[in-house]
Amino acid sequence: MHRSIAFLPLIALLACSPQSGTMHATEDQPTAAAGMIEDYTQTPVHIWEAEPERQSLGQLAYRGGLHIEHTDERFGGWSALEIDQDGTRLLAVSDSAYWMSAQLEWSDNGWLSGIEGIEITPLLGREGQELVGDEEDSEAIAHLGGSRYAVSFERNHRINGYDLGADHSGIHDAVGIALRLPPGAVDLPNNGGLEGMTAFDGDNILIGREYPPQDGAPYLLYYYDGQDWSDVRVASLPGFAVTSLTRYGDHIYMLERFYTQEDGTRIRIVRFPLESLAAGSLIEAELLGALEAANPVDNFEGISVIEHNGETTIVIVSDDNYNAYGNQRSLFLAFALED
């Protein structure tokens, strides 16, 4: 299948390269193998592990969580998350350049109850090739509208665009198209690149670098308003980093992560008004909830916000680093924002 590019009005972000004209593998390009995974386990988790009846977390009300386990070496490392606005279809990318497409199941009272139909597919490069080595570290997804998505990568810092087709039907052979990086992004640290990304209002895109220029300094986000790039500064706490961004309604939602060997992992879910992007002043984000030692805390790197069961529902996913350290999990947690 051969398709012409359809990223308008984000066409201004397209890199000028002769390879940038198709979004699906042609007959001369290999189509990578994909596969449904079966026999995985789903274990419910409590938000307060020592107090199973407790459901509140700051301004958030818990709406269920799952620990997903599978022996397939492709499963894990989930670093970004997008959920359709009806709350049923999930799309994720991993540190090893795989897509995951799946269906979310919810109980009648709005609790996350299961993940079914998990399919894992290689995420392809700009020549239709499978990605390996420093090319494979996919970190963020932004939904560009329709069936089009952008994916950011670190180590070899770049952004690719993909057309996945209706209901992700073209995910198996979607070829990356080069999108233009924000100014200076190519010089970011090897393992500290474009960690969060969200697109909105047709031609606006917001991208977050993982670490502030100096510890405790404001986070630096790159904002494209349809015409120009500008820097956005968001106040940070010492030791924290940006791991994900998403827009919902009139707010930007952001995940922050803290980790040291001595103190372990902490996660903050925050938000700030969309209109503050154009203000030019330092943004002070609103803390919605924080995960610490008493909670099922892990390396959460993906966030998506939807309207579900009449509530603003936040879903986060953790990157278990393929459990290389023996104590990490692939967790999917859901929360409702309490008014």
Tell me the role of every PLM-derived stretch.
Residues A6-A15:
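Bacterial N-terminal signal peptides
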Residues C16-D339:
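Sequence/structural signature of beta-propeller domains
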Residues M1-S4:
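Positively charged n-region of N-terminal signal peptides that target proteins for export
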